[in-house]
A protein has these predicted regions:
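Conserved catalytic core of sirtuin-type NAD+-dependent deacylases
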Residues: 1-239
Length: 239
C-alpha cells in the first residue's frame, strides 16, 4: 500500500524547546543586534565582520544543543508515511533527529558560500555551498578563487530559492502539519494555501490561529506536547 504523503512545515517554535534563540526571545542572542545589521545584504556590505561574528555565535550555540522530542517525533513519522520537512529554521536539528528529506527555506547555519554566488533570478549555485560544521568563518576566509565566504543564509530582502520546491510538496501532500510557526508569518501563511481542498491541516502552536478554515485542526500547545497529540490523532484515523 502506498504511503500517505505528509508535508511538515516547521518554524522557530520547534527548536525553541531545544534552547535555540529566536528573534522574539526576551534574552536571546538577537537582543544585542539589530536585524538590519546582521540579517540583510545591506548589513553584510556595511560590516561583514559583525555579521560573521553573529553567525559564529549562533553556530557555537547550535553545537551545544540537541534535538528535542518534537524533532524526534517528526522524524518517526517516516516509519509509516512519506514525509518531507519544510523548515524555516537554519539549524540542523531535524537532520540530527533522523529526518531524511528536508527543505531549508532560509538556508543552513552550518554551511557557507562565496558572497558573489547569488543573483535574484537563479539564487545561489549549489555546487559552491560548503559545509563547515560548527566552526567559525572570519574576514579573509575565502573560496578557492579568492572570494570572501558568507553564511549560507537567506537574509531579509533576498529571494527564497527553494520556495517553488516547497510549494510542490504542499500541493502533493495528503496531510499538512504546521509546527511552531503561525499563519501570520510568511512563508507559512502563503504555503498553506497551496494544500488541496481535501487535505486536512494540523497546526501545533500555543497561540490562537488567526485563520478560519474547516480543514484546520488546531492543537494548542508547544511543539513537544503537540506532536504527541498529533501522532495520537492520526494513529486513531489509521486504525
Amino acid at each position: 500500500m502506498k504511503k500517505q504523503k505528509i508535508a511538515v512545515l516547521t518554524g522557530a517554535g520547534v527548536s525553541a524547546e531545544s534552547g535555540i534563540s529566536t528573534f522574539r526571545d526576551a534574552n536571546g542572542l538577537w537582543d544585542n543586534y539589530n536585524v538590519e545589521d546582521v540579517a540583510t545584504l545591506e548589513g553584510w556590505n556595511r560590516n561583514p565582520a559583525l555579521v560573521l561574528d553573529f553567525y559564529n555565535q549562533r553556530r557555537r550555540q547550535l553545537a551545544t544543543v540537541k534535538p528535542n522530542a518534537a524533532h524526534l517525533a517528526i522524524a518517526s513519522l517516516e516509519d509509516n508515511y512519506d514525509v518531507t520537512v519544510i523548515t524555516q529554521n537554519i539549524d540542523n536539528l531535524h537532520e540530527r533527529a533522523g529526518s531524511t528529506r528536508i527543505i531549508h527555506l532560509h538556508g543552513e547555519l552550518t554551511k557557507v558560500r562565496p558572497e558573489n554566488r547569488y543573483n535574484e533570478r537563479n539564487g545561489f549555485s549549489e555546487d559552491m555551498v560548503f559545509d563547515i560544521g560548527y566552526g567559525d568563518i572570519n574576514l579573509g576566509d575565502t573560496s578557492v578563487d579568492g572570494v570572501q565566504l558568507r553564511p549560507h543564509i537567506v537574509w531579509f530582502g533576498e529571494a527564497v530559492p527553494k520556495i517553488e520546491q516547497a510549494i510542490d510538496v504542499v500541493e502533493a501532500a495528503d496531510i499538512l502539519l504546521i509546527v511552531g510557526t503561525s499563519l501570520q508569518v510568511y512563508p507559512a501563511a502563503g504555503l498553506y494555501a497551496y494544500a488541496k481542498a481535501s487535505t486536512p491541516i494540523y497546526i501545533i502552536d500555543p497561540k490562537d490561529v488567526p485563520v478560519r478554515d474547516g480543514r484546520i485542526t488546531h492543537i494548542k500547545s508547544v511543539a513537544t506536547v503537540g506532536m504527541e497529540k498529533f501522532i495520537e490523532i492520526i494513529s486513531k484515523k489509521d486504525e
